[in-house]
Amino acid sequence: MNRTPPYHRFHRAMALLSLSLLPLLLLAQSNPGRASTNATATYPIVDTGQTNCYDDTGSAISCPAGGQPFSGQDAQHNGHQPSYTNNGDGTITDNNTGLMWVQAVSSKMTYAAALAGAETFNLAGYDDWRLPTIKELYSLILFSGLDPSGCQSLSQCPDIVPFINTAYFDFAYGDTSAGERLIDAQYWSSTEYVATTMNGDATTFGVNFADGRIKGYPSEPVGPPGQQFTMSSFVRYVRGSSYGVNAFVNNGDGTITDQATLLMWAQADSGSGLNWEEALAWTAQKNAENYLGYNDWRLPNAKELQSIVDYSRAPAATSSAAIDPIFSVTPITDEGGSVNYPFYWTSTTHANWTAVPGQWSVYIAFGEALGWMQPPTGGDYVLQDVHGAGAQRSDPKSGNPDDWPYGNGPQGDVVRIFNFARLVRDAAPEPVVSHTIFLPTLAGSSPPAGR
């Protein structure tokens, strides 16, 4: 006769069951290096919308097959396609991010006014609007746009296209009749630069939807006494759950998974500078090598690469690149002889309005976004952080940097051409395996009532 109390018999059965399941539990933990991706992205990266392929001379080309020069560029990989809903009440919902945006173009205002305006802004019955972060604002950019830099008026370049979907969002170029440049269509974000730009200017990042760039802009009065001015930019308020927060996991095998975007990154970078064609070819080479166990790496598009910028970091503030230290970053000696961090290529062409639109490609500055500025009184050019670590600009795809001794554009953006690269791939969800576990049936093994 079994005199073991029912309570003890139950727990003995559970102990035996635990031992029988131990191999399964160990198997489930045997590969901690592969982060589980059985989840929906909380930070979905909206595709750039770029559909044309280009070579390095600026010509549009048929998208090349694998193994051919210039294969692997932005137009050859489709991510979350842009999708919006017009709510009919002055608001637009992004169906990928879930964010709700103001449809209309605001008047231009200072950064302080933009912050204050959000506190009292009310539209469509909502009063929880905010100034977007730089990652929220950048989610709207589309690289189907054409940069009008150098164009003086819409009559000179009537076929230009903004870097935002104007079927849903109202848009205006700079008012040339009021002395503005056509490209003066900057929008404030709420992301303040943790260092300073120019001559110690307090700086806040913004997106220019006319020329397709992220730059840091002066957010407080600048200029000599008696001649100070405060920059004004457009504002597009947003509401909804937070967007743009990474969830990095070190897989312990040279890869980093962002469980928020469901992208897997190479922990190390290219280790040296490459021109754009070389960066694409290097990516293909790594796939041929089955680098880190995968053969589906790609050069990230502009929005994918910007997603891993850490805007709480900057060389002058944290003595580091603007990226989570979970990643390895090769330091460089910059044009002024100082230790700095690289620009990184993307697969995205920065197309412009000229007859050869595709000569330039997008990069993200993970080090200082340097430029050569001449003092207002003249004299030698001075190398400065003009746009902030985390800026998105562009470089010629090929050529000699020595041909650009004082950079490019109104802030003398340094031209390197030989930028670094970091690989990305989709972190495919792991298959969900369903196990049916049969519990042992023991007489009297049910737990006693009340226990």
Where are these regions (language model features)?
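Generic secretory/membrane-interface signal
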Residues: 2-5, 23, 88, 252
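Bacterial N-terminal signal peptides that target proteins for export
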Residues: 2-18
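Bacterial N-terminal signal peptides
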Residues: 14-28
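Glycine-aromatic-enriched surface loops/turns that form tight recognition elements
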Residues: 29-130, 134-298, 303-433
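Conserved functional hotspot residues at active sites or interaction interfaces
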Residues: 440
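Short, solvent-exposed mixed-charge patches
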Residues: 449-451
